[in-house]
Amino acid sequence: MTDHVEPEGGNSSTLATSDLMVTRTGGFNSFSFVDDGATHGEVLLDSGARMQFQDLEAVIPCFTPGTKIATPRGERPVEELRSGDRVITRDNGLQEIAWVGQIQMPGTVLKANPHLKPILIKAGSLGNGLPEKDMLVSPNHRVIVANDRTHLFFDESEVLVASKHLLGTAGVHEVDVIATTYIHFMFERHEVVLSNGAWTESFQPDDFSLKGVGNSQRTEIFELFPELEEKRGVAAYETARRSLREEEAQAMFQP
């Protein structure tokens, strides 16, 4: 059930909860949060209706609208991709998307939770002229980094680094937006895809990221991949590259 709205500032937005997505016009009367290690709370709407939300801390790795993904048909905006579409992957050639999902992030939530704000990776900031165009991603979205230090520190030609762990390096910073949509897509395995000319990850289901999708989207994933309901199934969905911890990423990028 949806009820159309315009949030403060006159910009349309949607608020997603784990079970419900509501789009409405008018301001929010109040926002309340419970700090219990995740972000939980309640939104009181002008109409008097209340909406619960939870696990906003678990913002999953996502692209934002306008990001161009390399496909056999050329670059396509990520928001146009659907299940069954083929995408160019670094390791396994053309692969069909198994599932696509998204999370709406209204300005009210971003203002109350600044750590959820998208991160801008400026063109060229990953080295070797990559990405080719500015790229806006969620804080947990991981990108491929390949340089002399990946060999020196980790004996790896390429590693995955979360965008939030790149903060402080030249050309990477949080941005203030009125609202945004985080879009994610998944394959039969964790893949590396070309986005705005840079190699970045597809969605990888794990205990953390599965909390970040709503109940209905999580059900869709389990219908496609029933093995992911078990810990051993999640463990078998391996990461495409070594993923650096925050301290490892900082060590690699320090002057």
Name each region found by the language model.
Residues 1-61:
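Acidic, glycine-rich low-complexity segments
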Residues 26-36, 60, 75-79, 109-111, ...:
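Short linear motifs in intrinsically disordered
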Residues 49, 60, 130-154, 230-253:
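A broadly tuned preference for mixed-charge, low-complexity surface segments
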Residues 51, 76-78, 180:
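A broad, structural micro-motif
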Residues 55-58, 80, 99, 184:
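Extracellular/lumenal ectodomain signal focusing on beta-strand-rich modules
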Residues 64-73, 88-217:
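Long beta-strand-rich cores associated with HINT superfamily self-processing modules
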Residues 79-86:
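Structural motif
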Residues 98, 205-255:
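Non-catalytic peripheral regions of nucleotide-handling enzymes
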